[in-house]
Amino acid sequence: MTTSAVCAGDRLLATGGVSQIEGAAGGGLVPWAVITGDGTRDQIGVTAFYTVIEINDFRLKSSGVAVGVYDRLEISLARQLFTLEKTAPGQSIRQDIYGAKLKLAGDAVVDQDSWMPQISIGLQHKKNRDMRIPADLGARHDTGTDYYVSATKLYLAGFAGRNLLLNATLRATKANQMGLLGFGGDQRDHYQAVLETSAAVFLADYFVVGAEYRIKPDNLSVFREDNSADLFAAWFVNKRVSVTLAYARLGQLADKKQQDGVYLSLQLSH
């Protein structure tokens, strides 16, 4: 391996996405098929991120690192801290997420003469480290693994002369609120397939706006779990720094309804 192959970055700006809340490359809520970092097929890319979501009655912080190997394999690690604020003052829930993603076929950017998107498979193994409250709500397990397949395609000049990115992710999961409230419940304790989608428009090479929608299972009888959505804007300052600002609508969380607020994320790449 040559020196230039390590932590190099020759990929087009913004085509690696940002850091998803669970650590994978993608949008804010949804993993995409792209591999993290700016590395190409003979390079290794590294990203680090810090994200805060401030909603009506809760605060979620997520931080982590990810490595993209030869634009083929992605390994990620994230730690989440969910502060319960008004629901249980002084209480918080920690969760660790270990992720892996493998590109199977296609290239979201290069294959413009083909209909085929980039396709990747991935997993996110989650460990909830504070299960007292989730167990009280009916959660069955403190550990779970999500499995997903993502398809991502960039259409050059695909929308009003601007580049358009579309993504669809199918996830198999038992997680309650992405695992923050444990896994499985008294209503359901089996894997369910849920759809997650993203659409983004490149207003400039360095500025992207878009929306995401994430369907989630409803395993606990005590409170309903709503689906999540966001509207985001991502500014890629350069190949090393990006900032994402979003309006996140997370629906009901535990006993608090209509939880929405601001999502802010900083990503550093090398």
Q: What do the predicted segments below correspond to?
A:
Residues 190-191:
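Glycine- and Gly-Pro-enriched alpha-helical subdomains that act as flexible
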Residues 7-160, 164, 171-174, 183, ...:
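Transmembrane beta-barrel domains of Gram-negative outer membranes and organellar outer membranes
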Residues 187:
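Conserved short-loop catalytic and cofactor-binding motifs
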Residues 179-184, 196-199:
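Solenoidal tandem-repeat scaffolds enriched in leucines and small polar residues
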Residues 2-3:
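N-terminal signal peptide c-region/cleavage motif recognized by signal peptidases
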